[in-house]
Amino acid sequence: MHRTSVPRLLFLVGLFLLAPCGAFAAFDPSLLVGMKARSIGPAGMSGRVTSIAAVESNPNIVYIGAASGGVWKSVNGGVTWEPLFDDQPVASIGALAVFQANPDVVWVGTGEGNVRNSVSIGNGVYRSLDGGRTWTHLGLEKTERIHRVILHPTNPDVAWVAAMGQLWGENPERGVYKTEDGGKTWSRVLYVDPRTGAADLIIDPRNPNKLFAGMWQYRRWPWFFRSGGRGSGLWVTQDGGRTWNELTEADGLPPGDLGRIGLGISRSQPDIVYALVEAEKSVLLRSADGGKTWQSANKKPDVNPRPFYFGDIEVDPELPNRVYSLDYNVRVSDDSGANFKTLVSGSLIHGDFHAMWIDPKNPDTIYFGNDGGIGISRDRGRTAAFVTNLPLGQFYHVAVDMQQPYNIYGGLQDNGSWRGPNTVWQQGGIRSHEWLQIGGGDGFDTLPDLSDPNMAYALWQGGNLGRINVRTGEWRDIKPSPPDGVRLRFNWNAGVATDPFKPGTVYLGSQFLHKSSDRGETWATISPDLTSNNPEWQRQNETGGLTPDASGAENFTTIIAVAPSPLQEGVLWVGTDDGRLHVTRDGGKTWASLEKNVPGVPANTWIPHITPSRHDPASAFVVFDNHRRSDFAPYVYRTDDWGRTWKSLVTKDLRGYAHKLEQDPVKKDLLFLGTELGLWFSLDGGGRWMKWTHGVPTVPVMDLVIHPRDHDLVIGTHGRAVYVIDDIRPLRTMSEKTLAQPVHLYESGEVQQHWRGAEPGGFALGSSEYRGETEPYGAILTYSLNVPGLPLAEEEKERERELAERQARRQEPEQEPRTA
C-alpha cells in the first residue's frame, strides 16, 4: 500500500500489490508500506542519553546512544541528527565506541547500565564498518546490559566489553569480555559470580594491555533494590586481560562491602587514575602511580549521590587535576577531586547526567548526555546549549481529546506531562512551541476532561495527581488524603482513569480504588485492599543497599491498572503490581477476584494494562509483564465471560514483553499490541501477529489509542516519543474477499477544507529546529490490486518514494482538503 500526497482536490492514493495467491492467512505486512507512521515528536523535551562517542579527527561527527531510542549520528556538531539503529532487534543502548584509526568503525554495546526501575534490555554487541549505515551483531546476547566498550587503539580486532548482566536476576553472562578477532569469538576474562557484573572499564592510553575494571554486585526485585556486596571491587590487568589483580583495603580502598565504582584516567598523565567508590562511606580515590596505591581525594557526604543511577567520572584530557562528576548536575573539581562545584546545572540543560565526551584535542568542546537529551559546550562547560531536535521522549501513557485537530496528552520519564497537537494547519511541521507542559516530575497518565476542553489531569510519581486549566494555567493538587491511621501505598506509576459515563468522575488506585465525582475535590474509597498486602514486599524505606534510595520507585502491592468499561456503567477492571486481577459490575460494591482463572501466568505477575472491549461488556484484554523477574515472555489474554475463563493470544510471532493491547472499536478482531520491542498487529483476533515496521522503529511501545473520530492510531513509545498512523479504516474492511478482487476501493473518510497557513514567522531556529510530521494533504483513497505475478520491484518502490518527496516539496495551495 502506497500513499502519495496530491495537491488540492486530487486524491492521495494508496496502493499495495499482492502476491499471486492473495491468501489472507498469508498476508504480507510489508505490503502496507504506504500506511507509514509519522513521527510527531515532541523533541523539545527529549529523553535519556546514556553514551556519547565522537570522531577525534572531526568532532562534528558524533554518535549518541539513547536509553531506549537507539543510536543517532550527527555530522555537523549536533545541528541535525539521523537515527541509525531503527531496524535492529533492540533499542536500548549502553555504550558506544569509535575506532579512531578508522572512524567508520563503530561499536555498540546494548542494554542500558543506569539501572533504574524502568530500564530496557539489550542483546549484546554490534559493529558497523560504514559509519552506522549497516550493523553486524557480534554476540554476547545474554549479557542484557553493557556499560562500556573499550577498543584497542591500533588493532581493530581487539575490544573489551564491560557486561553488567541481568538486573532482575542472576546469570553467568557478566563480567569483562575480550575479543581478538573482531567479535567472532569472545573470552570472559574477568568474572566474579552470577550476581556481580562489570560496571566500568578504562584503558591506559599509553599501554593498551593495562585496564582497570569496576565490578559491581547489584540486584533489583519488583519491590526492592540492593547495591553492593562482597562481589564488588576494583581490578587491574597488565596483560590485556589474561590475568587480573584485585585491589584491596591494603591498597587504599575503603573497608567492608563496596558498591558501584566509576573510573577515570588522565590522558595527559596516565599514572593519575580516579575511582569513585560506593561504600558505607563513599569516597573519591586518586592514584598517582598508575593504580599501585590509592589515596582519598574526597570523603564528603555528597561526593557520590545516587550511584546506581549516576556514578561516572571523566578527567580533562589536558589537565590531570580537573575531574568531572556526572550526577544531578555536572560538577567539576580543579584540585584533583578535593572540592567540587556545579559547572552545568540541571536547571540549565536538564538534569541527571549519564554521559560525557570531551574533545581530546580541544577540551573546550564537550558533549553531555542526560535524562533530557544532549547538551553541548564550546567553552569547557562555562556555558552550554541544549539540543531540542532529538525525539527520544520516554512516554509512559498517551491519551487524546476531541478538539480539531485533536491533541495528544502524555507523561514522560523525568520530563513531566505535556499536551500537543497531532497535526497543525500550517506549513512548517509540528514544532516544539506547539507543546504545552501541564505537569512535572516523572509524568505518567495525562488525561483530558472530555466534558471541558480546558481541563486535564496529570499524574506524576507516587500517586500525585493534579488538575489543570490549560487555558488559565490554574493548578490544583487533588491526590486523596488517607484516613486516620491508614497509610496509602501508591505505585511509582499508579493506575488512574476517568469515567466514560460521568463527566468529572476520576478513579485513582493505591492499594484501594478511590473515586471522585467532582474532579478530585473529594474522594471516596470504593474497594477493599485489592492487593496481596504482603508485608515482605512493603520495605521500601530500606531499599537501596549501601546507599539508601527510598524514592518511592520500589513501592509495591499497589494498583497500577484501572479500566472502566466503555459499554456498561459501573463495570471496572483493576490490576495490581503483585498480580491481582479484579472486576466489579456494580460500581465497587462487590468485587470478583480473577487472577486464579488465568492459565499459564506466573504468580504475582505485574498487570500494567487492561483493555475492556468496545464490543461486549463481558470481554476484556489483559497484558501481564513479568520482566521484573527476568521473564521476558509476552503474556496477553482475553476473556469473554467476565473473567471466568481466559484465552492466551500469544503466538510464536511475538517478541518482547507486552505493555498494552488496543482493540479496534469497529472491527473486533483488529488488534494492536505494544511490546518492549515494537508495535504488533493482528487481523484475526490474535491468531497471527505481525510486526508493524512502516515508520515505527524497534522501540518500547508503552501505550496505544485509536482516535474515535479520526480513526488514527496514536502510539506512545518509551524512547522515540509519539507516532501516528493516519486512518486505519482500510484494515477494518480488508478481507480475503476484498484482496481477491482485481481492484477494490476501501472506505474513505469525510474531508474538511481548512486554511493551510504559511509558516509563522518569529520562531525559526534554522536547520536545528525539529519539525514533527503533519498529516498528509488531501483525502486518502486506498485501493488494492490483485494482479497475478505483478512484481513490486525495488525500483518501483524507489520511484514511489521519489514521487512522494517531490510532491512534498511542491508549493502548497492556500486551501487544502483534510481528512476529518
What are these regions (language model features)?
Residues 10-22:
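Bacterial N-terminal signal peptides
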Residues 4, 34, 44, 123, ...:
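General helical secondary-structure elements
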Residues 7-8, 13, 53, 132, ...:
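Intrinsically disordered, low-complexity segments enriched in polar/charged small residues
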Residues 24-769, 776-779, 786-788:
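Beta-propeller blade termini and top-face loops
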Residues 758-819:
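Contiguous beta-strand segments within globular domains
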Residues 1-11, 346:
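Bacterial N-terminal signal peptides that target proteins for export
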